[in-house]
Amino acid sequence: GYMVILQAADAEAERARVTGLGVRVVDELDSGDYRASHFHPADFGGVLTSIDQQRSAPDYLEPYGDWMPAGPDWRDARTADVLDLAAVTILSADAPALAARWATLLGTPPSAADPLVLPLKHGEIRFEPAAAGAPTLVAAITLKVADPAEIRRRALAAGVVGSDGAIRIGGVRFDISG
């Protein structure tokens, strides 16, 4: 994977704060009630990162609020199977340095228990070491699901479970928990 999208209470304030740290914006989308800033991957250690806001959703932590990129009818496609997106895992040859960089860029201190984890208000970003010279990438998404056994059964039927037992779609590992 190549991109992490985060929601904020005030995307324009976050844009100003992050660019004030020397990070370049590669795209801004300010359309109606929606604000988004895509930051240069090189400035985020190799991952395209976007900080977005949907102004018509008064509480950005509300999981079923408006979200313009998903279209007006996204709720109709929602399923009761997935309860939450719990974490994103980024693989990096220098995971400690990248975790520290992201902590600065996001204004989020690392977990006291694990400096490779950045706790967010609704989930976390995890950093895992990769082999020297390996590219930085989004390696995994952790989903909290209603029935992990059923999700695994469907993944097997869809042929997206590898020989290592991991569910992978588009090169990204999907970790599931109940």
Give, region by region, the residue ranges found by the protein language model.
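Aromatic-enriched hydrophobic runs in primary sequence
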Residues: 1, 11-14, 19, 74-78, ...
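Vicinal oxygen chelate
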Residues: 1-93, 121-126, 132-178, ...
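Aromatic-residue detector
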Residues: 2, 71, 82, 102-105, ...
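A generic short-segment signal for beta-strand/edge and adjacent turn/coil regions
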Residues: 5-9, 18-22, 55-59, 87, ...
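Surface-exposed interaction/gating patches
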Residues: 71-114
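Intrinsically disordered, low-complexity segments enriched in Gly and acidic/Ser/Thr residues
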Residues: 96, 100-142, 146, 152
